Amino acid sequence: MGCFHSREPTATGKTKKEEPTSAVKTNKEEKSSNYVSEPTTMEKIKKDDVYTIILIGDQATGKSSVLQRFKNNQFEVCHKPSPIIIDCFTKKIQIEGKKISLKCYDTAGQEKFRALSQSYYRCADGIMLFYDIANQKTFDNVGRWLEEVHRLAGPNVPILIIANKCDLNEKRVVNFNNAKKFADDKNIPIIEVSAKESLGVEEAFIKLASEINKTWKPLPDNETVTIGM
């Protein structure tokens, strides 16, 4: 699985952008759907830029809950690992008067799914890296995740570290000042959020989109990116 560029037009003369197909739950109109086994396509959006954001981090760091809060402004407690390996949806936002479509991929944190999740890095325009402020191990693993990102997505992809579950301050084991020093040393921004209390979630997505926007170079009209087998 990987990314490649295609310049071949469709029968209508318009290029199309293929969506991830392997064990992926897709959502064209922000509605839930089942696994897709056949490729799905979407005509390239002309008026909006499409930024692909990948959510990564250890299992149970709250990636899915943050995505649900951003998507539907709802909070769902996930007690069990999701059967979905990659969950995808698109949401439109506006940055400095510019319309942006954020295509967000929530990757499974389970080790057994890492190979599939990693294949999406190469197509990422930006990455959110999660840890749980009440779980020291998830923060200790941030360095390993960063190494993986730099190896697979390249050294220049914008990254935002997400210190999640800040509503659990009484259970905090990761001091934010220490985490910020770690992030500052690597020149990576960091933000605390809470999906439960709806704190900082939308701000985080806008912040990362703004970083992407600084160096964004859209594909030519006759060129598309494909993610798939």
UniProtKB/Swiss-Prot annotation:
Posttranslational mods: Although this sequence lacks the C-terminal cysteine motifs subject to isoprenylation in other Rab proteins, it does have N-terminal myristoylation and S-palmitoylation sequence motifs.
GO MF assignments: GTP binding; GTPase activity
A biological process from GO: exocytosis
Lipid-carrying residues in chain (S-palmitoyl cysteine): C3
Disulfide bonds: none
Assigned GO CC terms: membrane
Skewed-composition ranges (Basic and acidic residues): 15-32
Residue positions of motif Effector region: 79-88
Lipidation, N-myristoyl glycine type: G2
Superkingdom: Eukaryota
Positions contributing to GTP binding: 57-64, 106-110, 164-167
InterPro entries membership: P-loop_NTPase, Rab_GTPases_membrane_traffic, Small_GTP-bd, Small_GTPase
Keywords (A to Z) from UniProt: GTP-binding, Lipoprotein, Myristate, Nucleotide-binding, Palmitate
Segments for region (Disordered): 1-39
Family (UniProt): Belongs to the small GTPase superfamily. Rab family.
Designated name of the protein: Ras-related protein RabZ
